[in-house]
Amino acid sequence: MLTPKGSAADTLPSAAEILATVRLQQTQQKIDLQGQLRQDALVVPFRLTQNGPVIRYSFTNPPETLQLRLGDTDSRLEELSQSDVEKITPAQFDRKVHGTSVTYEDLAFKFLYWPNARVVGEEPVRSRRCWKLELQAPSRESQYSNVVLWVDRQSGALMETEGYDWRGRLAKRFEVISVQKIEGQWFLKQMRIEELQPGTGKVQSRTYLEINK
């Protein structure tokens, strides 16, 4: 739980402190669940397993296993096969996951480690008090120049994320729609991912990431 420093109640924690809390929150799960990516008529089932900082997405049609390792200073997204482990490189970041709006970079959580970040203030998201952060990409390896985060003050959970292209236009939005309690812990139930037309803000595609108990 984030606790503002200092005597003043409205003193903001640093962006580094908030991001450290988000990373910690992301690595505290131990789960084995079923989920799906749903975009219009397309439904892509997957198995989601996590053991601390290692998160695995296992798809069956076609077969693909993606593994995310959340480290202290960086994350690593890998593609697993029966005989090999291949690191996902920045050149593959814009590759879409099974034809949905979700890309490899979106699964990699690289932005949680970007050093150029600042706290803008506090804004509510779905009645939750959230810190609002602006992050700047350290290089053009990312498809996003800037990312804006809304982080739940109490839990450190990501409630909403916006990614902007290299012309400063909103390109993608991730929003937690609902959560659920699994074995005494709150966990994502549904997230909406919207890919937007640059410059107009019109939604080009909408994908839902849904997790079942």
Indicate where each model-derived feature is located.
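Short, surface-exposed beta-strand/loop "edge" segments at domain boundaries and coil↔beta transitions
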Residues: D40-V44, P62-R69, S81-I88, E141-Y144, ...
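Short, exposed beta-strand/loop patches in secreted or surface proteins that constitute
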Residues: P45-Q50, Q67-L70, A117-E122, I177-V179
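One face of beta-strands
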Residues: I31-G35, F46, I55-Y57, S145-V147, ...
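N-terminal cleavable signal peptides for secretion/export
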Residues: L2-G52
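Flexible, processing/modification-adjacent segments and terminal tails
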Residues: D10-A20, L24-K30, D72-S145, D165-G168
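Gly/Pro-enriched, hydrophobic low-complexity segments
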Residues: R129-K213
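A generic structural motif
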Residues: Q36-D40, S58-T60, E78-Q82, Q136-P138, ...
